[in-house]
Amino acid sequence: MSNFSEIINQPKPVLVDFFAEWCGPCKMMSPILKEVKDELGENVSIIKIDVDKNPSLASQYKVRGVPTLVLYNKGQQVWRQSGLVQKREIVSIIQKIS
């Protein structure tokens, strides 16, 4: 993904979901992330990166397990969590930096 650095350097927070198609918890995160986007709207960008299709990007960002959520604010990593994360926790963290 050649424009990844451009995406995470946006002026608004960017939540990156590193996932895999075969991952059960990743599938459970999908509707949670949709709810986050519905609640926060244009205040956040959410992108999904398939680690099987982008292994070099996953390696570069030291993704060891999926799902891994990474939140960037103006290109700087401000939060990172592996595993299933609840909507209210994600919304709260994004609102703190917005």
What does each model-identified segment do?
Residues 11-12, 19-22, 65:
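Short pre-active-site segment immediately N-terminal to redox-active cysteine/selenocysteine motifs
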